[in-house]
Amino acid sequence: MKKIIALFMCAAMLLCFAACGNSEQILVAEKESAGESVACENEDFADYTYTAVDTQAKALMEVNAGTADAAIVDYVMSIGSIGAGTDYEGLVIDGEGYSEEEYGIAFRKGSDLTAKVNEIIRDLKTSGELVNIAKNYKLDGILLGDEKSEAFAQAETDSDYEYVMNKGTLVIGITYFAPMNYENEAGELVGFETEFAKAVCAKLGVEAVFQEISWSAKETELAAKNIDCIWIGMTITEEREENMSISIPYMQNKQVKVVKSK
């Protein structure tokens, strides 16, 4: 119901914006993302016509191709995707950004695995291993991972921890976007979250198995046990905390407007 109301409000605001603005500028963002919320709710974009796209990568492609005038994407994504030395050298961030937020890993509601992973995140941060991984992708300045949480205690019934340990794998739902999860020139899966997840799994003593999923189907995939966690640069929100078990925050983020450099 919340999602339906939110979508209705978004549509209403977009109609209002379209009525008030005379510009034909096109704004794009990933469907059902934090970027879409900014596009729908922020008055800075009242003169834009908004169009949803499948992925953040597609949003940047549209701006680069000239089929859109601006995109709203994660600041984290922009670090590895635009500017000098990237495929989108002609794209830049316009302004200071919107919607300060934090990333977390999502597990099934009530999962005892969350507390165990929280312990490992803090250990990796304290040892410096997580910082070193972040430095490889120029993300160390926005790294978190120090927050306290409940101590791990294995559940007596329906233990996700036991389930994962018995099968020896942690199936991780991902989407592809640099610098979090992407393929290098050799076709190997790399990225901050890829290395981070492997480090956590090494501490758990299980194999990290990465499975690409659709952003819009992430909750369904998790509930159906097609994946064991959602690890895709996911913003922590009250609604998600109500429906899933979320790890401690591991990275700061914000939404930014990306345009072609002048």
Named regions from a protein language model:
Residues M1-M9:
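Positively charged n-region of N-terminal signal peptides that target proteins for export
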Residues C16-A19:
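C-terminal motif of bacterial Sec signal peptides marking the signal peptidase cleavage site
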Residues G21-S23:
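Bacterial signal peptide processing site
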Residues Q25, A29-E32, I82-S99, K198, ...:
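Acidic, polar ligand-binding/catalytic clefts
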Residues Q25-E89, I93, S111, V256-K262:
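Pocket-lining segment of extracytoplasmic ligand-binding domains
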Residues E36-T51, G90, D94, I121-E162:
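Ligand-binding clefts/hinges and TM-proximal coupling segments of bilobed small-molecule sensing domains
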Residues N42, T49-V53, L60-E62, D74, ...:
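Extracytoplasmic small-molecule ligand-binding "clamshell" domains
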Residues E100-I120, V256-K262:
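A bilobed periplasmic-binding-protein/Venus flytrap-type ligand-binding module shared by bacterial periplasmic
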